[in-house]
């Protein structure tokens, strides 16, 4: 092959591409345009976060009133201030994270898994400082009852959270599910602190705190499974 042949090949390759049928372009444009519908913008982030905080607080209180608020009636002022101040902070952080996870590009305070881990550690520290009764009377039977009640309260909390944030888009479905599950778990823990009169340290350290990681993992697994494309 000579240099002239190579030049001819390159010139033909660089030549103008054949035109596309205008009718085909019109059909493509029409098909795309027919599927584009206007959407309402999300409310401001602070409104969404405030709504999540309100949902968690109202459901926790409603659950405690339904089961009777024996726990908070038995607490001292110091115990009430320490436990519920911590829960309020954790619920607020979880609410902000939930909103950030459904708004692409939104800055996050921390990864959801870190919130879940830090929340468990902080609750364990506060419970360990406040409650010094280390008896384990009916540890399993009482514990399973509290765990079940906390998880049962977390279910409507997670549904309400999903409904409020349903118009958002989660780039990382598992992380968003973990954040929502953690928030729902915190609502369950708050309800238990209002309701449960058992202040034995092993009971609250194991069964009350267990609601938080269980709900977080369940939320992440559910979101990941739901977001996985069908094969």
Q: Which residues fall in each region the model found?
A:
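Positively biased amphipathic helices and basic secretion/translocation or surface-docking motifs
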Residues: 11-48, 222
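Selected alpha-helical membrane-embedding segments in polytopic membrane proteins
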Residues: 39-136
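Alpha-helical transmembrane segments of multipass membrane proteins
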Residues: 59, 91, 95, 122-124, ...
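Non-cytosolic membrane-interface motifs at loop->transmembrane helix junctions
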Residues: 75-82, 137-149, 174-176, 201-210
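C-terminal ends of transmembrane helices
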Residues: 94-106, 161-169, 223-224
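Cytoplasmic-side transmembrane-helix entry/capping segments in multi-pass membrane proteins
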Residues: 106-120, 143-144, 172-182
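C-terminal halves and exits of single transmembrane alpha-helices
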Residues: 116-142, 160-167, 191-196
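Terminal transmembrane helical module of multi-pass membrane proteins
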Residues: 163-231
């Amino acid at each position: 092959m000579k240099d002239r042949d190579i030049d001819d090949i390159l010139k033909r390759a660089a030549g103008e591409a054949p035109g596309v049928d205008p009718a085909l372009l019109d059909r493509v444009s029409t098909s795309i345009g027919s599927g584009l519908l206007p959407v309402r913008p999300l409310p401001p982030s602070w409104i969404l976060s405030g709504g999540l905080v309100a949902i968690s607080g109202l459901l926790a209180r409603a659950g405690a009133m339904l089961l009777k608020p024996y726990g908070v009636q038995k607490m001292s002022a110091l115990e009430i201030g320490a436990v519920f101040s911590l829960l309020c902070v954790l619920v607020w952080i979880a609410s902000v994270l939930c909103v950030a996870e459904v708004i692409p590009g939104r800055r996050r305070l921390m990864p959801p898994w870190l919130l879940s881990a830090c929340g468990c550690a902080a609750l364990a520290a506060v419970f360990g400082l406040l409650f010094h009764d280390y008896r384990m009377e009916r540890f399993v039977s009482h514990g399973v009852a509290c765990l079940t009640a906390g998880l049962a309260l977390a279910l409507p909390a997670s549904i309400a959270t999903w409904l409020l944030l349903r118009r958002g888009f989660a780039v990382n479905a598992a992380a968003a599910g973990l954040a929502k599950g953690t928030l729902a778990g915190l609502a369950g823990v708050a309800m238990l602190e209002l309701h449960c009169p058992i202040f034995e340290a092993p009971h609250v350290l194991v069964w009350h705190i267990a609601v938080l990681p269980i709900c977080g993992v369940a939320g992440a697994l559910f979101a990941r499974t739901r977001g996985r494309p069908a094969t």
